[in-house]
Amino acid sequence: MVKGELLYEGKAKRIFRSSEEGELWVEYKDDATAFNGEKKETLAGKARLNNDISSLIFATLAKKGIPSHFIRRLSDTEQLVKQVDIIPLEVVVRNVVAGSMAKRLGIEEGIALKKPLVEFYYKDDALGDPLVTEDHIAILDVAAAEEVAQLKQMAAAVNNELIELFATVGVQLIDFKLEFGRTQAGELLLADEISPDTCRLWDKDTKERFDKDLFRRNLGNLQEGYQEILSRLGGLYHV
């Protein structure tokens, strides 16, 4: 298997063609960004941490019957994944009030929701990734109604598994962002990554943060927070 040409470079990853048909080579970057790229810094070791954590979580979800694009970890900073067409929606699941929800609605951070809330955001940097309703999604024509229902169902299943996974190691899953893609056959797969870049993760007892808010809000050392998550998960799960 050979790493091919660069197809796409985003804020946190580079995507390369693979010599195997239907597969792509993902390379994580040490770059940390926030506020739609307005804040940016290179943090040594971040690529390895995100790759390790995301690989571990995708492998764990696969064992629970939740399909994703993940095939295997290739190196400290690389993964092999199935090629999918990414749906331009971020699916956000919230268990506790935090971040933009607290700011948007004027609710104090840390309040547990009576039930998980699923939100959709339209992936468009120029528009600032706006919050959209299911009616907006229909107008944008980026996903059929039955696909939206499936996205919500899959997001709920991921939430249930991640809550249990993190609770086992004393971590509270506050909220997280998912992305999905379609295979050539039309199957919906979980895609992108699941890491402290895409999840808010607090210590269950102390409420210490182990996620990108460390960088976003200047709350502490990002690499130390991510390493804490990897160390806790690594004690119980192995790819």
Curated annotation (Swiss-Prot):
Record's keyword terms, sorted: ATP-binding, Ligase, Nucleotide-binding, Purine biosynthesis
A Pfam family assignment: SAICAR_synt
Top-rank taxon: Bacteria
InterPro entries on file: SAICAR_synt/ADE2_N, SAICAR_synt_PurC, SAICAR_synth, SAICAR_synthetase, SAICAR_synthetase_CS
Catalytic activity reported: 5-amino-1-(5-phospho-D-ribosyl)imidazole-4-carboxylate + L-aspartate + ATP = (2S)-2-[5-amino-1-(5-phospho-beta-D-ribosyl)imidazole-4-carboxamido]succinate + ADP + phosphate + 2 H(+)
Pathway(s) it belongs to: Purine metabolism; IMP biosynthesis via de novo pathway; 5-amino-1-(5-phospho-D-ribosyl)imidazole-4-carboxamide from 5-amino-1-(5-phospho-D-ribosyl)imidazole-4-carboxylate: step 1/2
Parts of the chain that traverse the membrane: none
Example GO biological process: cobalamin biosynthetic process
Enzyme class: ligase
CDD domains linked to this entry: SAICAR_synt_PurC
Enzyme Commission numbers on file: 6.3.2.6
MF annotations from Gene Ontology: ATP binding; phosphoribosylaminoimidazolesuccinocarboxamide synthase activity
Family designation: Belongs to the SAICAR synthetase family.
NCBIfam families tied to this protein: purC (TIGR00081)
UniProt name for this protein: Phosphoribosylaminoimidazole-succinocarboxamide synthase
Organism from which the protein derives: Shouchella clausii (strain KSM-K16) (Alkalihalobacillus clausii)
